[in-house]
Amino acid sequence: MKTTISSKGIRHSLGIPGTGWSYQTPLKKWNDNNQAPNIGNNSQEQKNTTENDYQKLEFSFLKKLICPKEEMALAQGIQACLLQDYSEAELYLNQALCYVDGAFTLGVIYLNEGRYTEAEMQLAKAEQTPESIGEFYRKYDLGMKMHIEITPYYAVDYEANAMASYIAHVKAFQQLNRHADACRLLLALYKAMPQNLDVMIFLAEIVLEKEPGNQQWMNAIINMTNNLQNDSYAHAVLLLSKAEAFDNIGMTEVAITTLTSVLSKKKDRPLDFLLEAQYQRGVLFLKIGKKTQAKKDLNAVFAINPGYANVNQLLGQL
């Protein structure tokens, strides 16, 4: 069970949650007797996870006397996030910007609220001392994690640390259409961590969206994923991007072979991801005139989701 920080709120999740700060049922305020609140239909484990984080930031009277006011503001800001009171969280966190985690947490909140310019500024501030990002979270052993959607089919969890800030920063750049800045940061991360699949997936996602006709970038994606096998879901997502890069440089049959590799393993793969891979393969079969194979793939997609993309229209052409 994880409590995640993502650009939709703080929430509990057994699997990969959504993007942002999310929390499916807001944590209610503690009553005057300091008893745990009733937070609706969440499981006991979920309630315990969130309440534990909240309680860890409920400082004793003595702690409040000796605690720096900025640290107290940071604690109260994170508590406000747990309550989904982001306006109050912002007020507190703006009093705690001398702490790197004040800027980091505020940056994530701004990302959640679609205030991308402000998010980028706060994350850049936090990254001036990257080794300090997450110190407050570690000090109080908080279970919250950074969560970002990289593609429609793939999201990542990170503890509060420099990597979490960098990935959030890339997301802010992406939303601001500052794709050159996003790629520059991702390339720096790739140079430092050439085996990091999350970085490669994010880089491929942005490049394929904005530079599909750039052969140099397409070759870079292909070379970056050289010898990649379908060993995990992350590998499969990256192979989906690789197939698109192959098709963009005219190597459609190689793209089809790559998609066949993606579809060779279905266990622990989300249905929407598998549908997209099969749909793309069907489209490519149609592109090279292999109508029988195209019809088979597109019919398989239609059987599960008749409204998927333009699958109905494509089948009407066969």
Predicted regions mapped to residue ranges:
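Alpha-helical repeat scaffolds
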Residues: 88-94, 118-128, 180-189, 214-228, ...
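Alpha-helical segment of the N-proximal tetratricopeptide repeat
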Residues: 49-96, 164-176, 181, 254
